[in-house]
């Protein structure tokens, strides 16, 4: 949760200066959207401008993991992501400084290109196993990423099983993970995709088009998984334009069984939203469990 005590602006400015090699003094600071989890600010010094996320000091590992994910996606040279500048903790806060991006309005070509770029990210390789070099977060929820050989095992145990255990502690009328996990493994069966570097939290608010027309993806929960998890989430919470899917499938054609797997993959996010926010997500998650697992 964001904190109300004064932020360590001087410390942040000093670290920006040290990291970039350019003197930076905050001439202007304004509050901008940081999402449901963090506080967001724009810091300006002449032509230099940065986006800063703030949270409680104990959340510094969340920002460290986000920076690692952004750096890994950038290294593939497939899709634009915000460049992390620096991160740290001071005076009761943790912070992540990113390059400032100017968002515009996308057209058919830019959304088509975003789909192509995401497919290229998914095909970039980089790991023989599923998981990630460190645990990270999905929103504010811890996301475990132990290296795992089997995709069915990874998703069943470390995605749905983990979120279900949290949900049962919040509301006892969810099924036991000990019952659900074997069913998920059976449903995914022998699906063993090549591990893809995925964004991990790609709803419509985390994809945008810059004023230059270049597509960009934001706020990742990165790991190596099934590329379909990203595609599935783009259809949740508003969806992406049709041109995006045309572009994606021009590089990576749709595979049989995706419509069934999509429900399973998006159940992870609905469970996470219940664990974060409660409310109607409980009923939605229970309906999805019945729909895809007959539970």
From Swiss-Prot:
PANTHER family: FRUCTOSAMINE 3 KINASE-RELATED PROTEIN, PROTEIN-RIBULOSAMINE 3-KINASE. It is an enzyme of class 2 (transferase). This is Probable ketoamine kinase slr1563. Belongs to the fructosamine kinase family. It comes from Synechocystis sp. (strain ATCC 27184 / PCC 6803 / Kazusa). ATP binds at residues 99-101. InterPro entries: Fructo-/Ketosamine-3-kinase, Kinase-like_dom_sf. Gene3D superfamilies: 3.90.1200.10, Phosphorylase Kinase, domain 1. Ketoamine kinase that phosphorylates ketoamines on the third carbon of the sugar moiety to generate ketoamine 3-phosphate. Keywords: ATP-binding, Kinase, Nucleotide-binding, Transferase. The active site is at residue 201. One of its GO terms (molecular function) is ATP binding. Its EC number is 2.7.1.-.
């Amino acid at each position: 949760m964001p904190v109300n005590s004064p932020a360590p602006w001087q410390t942040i400015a000093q670290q920006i200066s040290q990291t970039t090699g350019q003197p930076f003094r905050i001439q202007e600071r304004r509050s901008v959207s940081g999402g449901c989890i963090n506080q967001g600010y724009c810091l300006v010094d002449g032509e230099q401008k940065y986006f800063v996320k703030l949270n409680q000091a104990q959340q510094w590992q969340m920002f460290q993991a986000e920076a690692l994910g952004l750096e890994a996606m950038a290294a593939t040279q497939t899709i634009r992501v915000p460049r992390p500048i620096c991160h740290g903790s001071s005076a009761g806060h943790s912070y992540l400084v990113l390059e400032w991006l100017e968002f515009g309005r996308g057209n058919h070509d830019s959304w088509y290109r975003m789909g192509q770029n995401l497919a290229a990210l998914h095909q970039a390789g980089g790991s023989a196993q599923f998981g990630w070099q460190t645990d990270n977060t999905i929103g504010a929820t811890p996301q475990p990423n132990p290296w795992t050989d089997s995709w069915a095992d990874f998703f069943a145990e470390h995605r749905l099983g983990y979120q279900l255990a949290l949900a049962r502690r919040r509301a006892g009328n969810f099924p036991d993970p000990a019952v659900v996990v074997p069913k998920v493994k059976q449903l995914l069966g022998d699906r063993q995709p090549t591990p893809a570097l995925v964004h991990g939290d790609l709803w419509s608010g985390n994809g945008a088009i810059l004023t230059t027309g270049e597509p960009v993806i934001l706020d990742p929960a990165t790991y190596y998984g099934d590329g379909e998890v990203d595609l599935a989430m783009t259809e949740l919470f508003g969806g992406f334009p049709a041109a995006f899917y045309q572009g994606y499938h021009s590089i990576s054609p749709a595979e049989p069984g995706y419509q069934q797997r999509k429900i399973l993959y998006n159940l992870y996010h609905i469970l996470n939203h219940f664990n974060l926010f409660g409310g109607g997500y409980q009923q939605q998650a229970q309906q999805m469990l019945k729909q895809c697992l007959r539970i």
